Amino acid sequence: MAIINMSDLDLQGKRVLIREDLNVPVSNGVVTSDARLRASLPTIELALAKGAAVMVMSHLGRPTEGEYNPEYSMQPVVDYLAKALSCPVRLATDYLDGVDVAVGEVVVFENVRFNVGEGKNNEALSKKMAALCDVYVMDAFGTAHRAQASTHGVGMFAPIACAGPLLAQELDALGKALDNPARPMVAIVGGSKVSTKLTVLESLSGIVDQLVVGGGIANTFIAAAGYNVGKSLYEADLIDEAKRLVANAKSRGADIPVPTDVVVAGEFSPTAAATLKSVSEVADGEMIFDIGPDSAEALAKIIESAGTIVWNGPVGVFEFDQFGEGTKRIAQAIADSKAFSIAGGGDTLAAVDKYGIADKVSYISTGGGAFLEFLEGKELPAVAMLEKRGA
């Protein structure tokens, strides 16, 4: 990939516009989860260290486009950055016709979604943004799958468009996991529905040695193997699809293992009583909420021998402890593995946090939808733009 990297550029005295993903939860004007802000700090600090005048932009929440709404203001982010960075940080509300920013200063633009044309990648808006800078830095992997004015259009018209360290790191890690993986390669794909992850499953079943399915997705594969799944969440209309994926994997010597034992309950609730059963013994009134210990051990062994691990989604309803043992065992196996491991997707990150294995995973992806689209083998518009500008 012929992408220019920000770290290779001379930014002394340059006006640098950085698109970050600073879309964080805010309550009563205070940021309540700062993971994305912390992830963006090294990029902003590097631009300052290189002698740049720094402008930062992002979306926050889903305001009505073109309408100012104080609920979605970037002010809480500005307050956070002002404490985290040892330099002046201020909010610019009216910036499209020009903004004063000095070397060593950080100006944060108000929510890009307050601009008419952001979502549709409007050319006039993109050109206005591009005119504000000497160098545009795309550093928001979490929005790289969206072709919008602040993530794509601006980069087409800026004098120079490059990848920030966070985005470059993300692309390197994903490339390492998918383009030239150390074998055996194992992918764990959980989630409630096959339909939402079908293209991911198809793409991965063509490259992995073992494809582990979990959650509601696994129930459809259990049903496809001829077992009763009771009242479990599953998709009857996708049973043939599941059979086809299993056959395709087998034809290339790969495997999609089905659990041999499961944890069931009669209702979905934090206090539901968990019962361990063989997969062949699920009754009509029961729902499968986790894999059993034998299945978890079998999967742990698969993970143990892996060279590359891609993890997207838990294997059970881990939010309730009685249905969390399967996900916990898998998390532990990934933590103990010497393989290159990459984890991504909201629920996955919650599991990584719950079981305290963040420092044992080789790379944790910041992008939800972008991570999935990369796994699907889709071209990410922002990455395509950077490749075009780098050529």
Curated annotation (Swiss-Prot):
GO terms for cellular component: cytosol. It is an enzyme of class 2 (transferase). Gene3D superfamilies: Phosphoglycerate kinase, N-terminal domain. Pfam families: PGK. Substrate binds at residues 21-23, 36, 59-62, 113, 146. HAMAP family: Phosphoglyc_kinase. This is Phosphoglycerate kinase. It comes from Shewanella baltica (strain OS223).
